Amino acid sequence: LSVVELFIGFEYNEIDKLEFVRVIMIKFLNDIRNVEKPISNNRKIINTIAVLFLGIALGTFSKFLDFRQAELPSVLMAINGVLDIGNFLGRFAIWVLIALCISIYSNSAIRASINVFAFFIGMVASYYLYSNYIAGFFPRSYAMIWFGFTAVSPLLAFVCWYARGKSKLAFILSALILAVLFNMCFVYGCWYFNAKSVLEVIVFIIGLIVLRRDTLRSSALMGTISIVLAVLLDMVIPFHFG
């Protein structure tokens, strides 16, 4: 055989190996969760635009609430005074919950990545554009955290989409997601346990509902395992994005 023939044969072998790996990976992921009902391209575009505008609206509202507290309508001011909505929106838990909902209710893992990324692009951009051009300041260090989180959000959304599957791996993934959410919603130690706010308690409960399993027993087991995982995570990574 000539050198060219050997090279071509090597290339074909490499392509075959890559194709084999791709097929195995697709089968592995489909065993966790498969696309249930394909949707049209028009519907995909509409959904992505909708979550983009949702992000823009929530980012703008969050910064408005933070910057214009003294100018809020009396009812909204009273609600904010009781629930401390401004600080609640400044923490991670609510945004992680919204992203989780967008992810698992998307049509596929790829769509979850696109939709969640669009949401965070809209939310983070509107928040910091408002902060810079209307409020007149730009908190660079805090913004860098959100920019980084936005950059990795497609990967996280891709993984989270599979949490609604029926396999054992999906069950473990759901428990791990809840563990992260638990550490964002609660502060605890050897002799104390507190919720950051009543709104964070609601966030965690909604997370449980969204990730619930087919039976009450399985859901309760998932919640219990998530708390154990949360404590273990707290030992390894004591810093929380809260």
Task: State what each model feature region is.
Residues 185-197, 204-220:
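Membrane-helix boundary connector in multi-pass membrane proteins
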Residues 155-170, 208-222, 232-234:
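Membrane-water interface at the C-terminal end of transmembrane alpha helices
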Residues 232-242:
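Juxtamembrane boundary at the C-terminal end of a transmembrane helix
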Residues 1-25:
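N-terminal amphipathic/basic-hydrophobic helices that include classical n-h-c signal peptides
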Residues 114-123, 172-181, 218-230:
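Central hydrophobic cores of alpha-helical transmembrane segments
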Residues 93-103, 149-161, 202-207:
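Hydrophobic cores of alpha-helical transmembrane segments in multi-pass inner/ER membrane proteins
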Residues 26-124, 128:
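N-terminal topogenic module of multi-pass integral membrane proteins
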Residues 128-194:
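Membrane-proximal helix-loop-helix units in multi-pass membrane proteins
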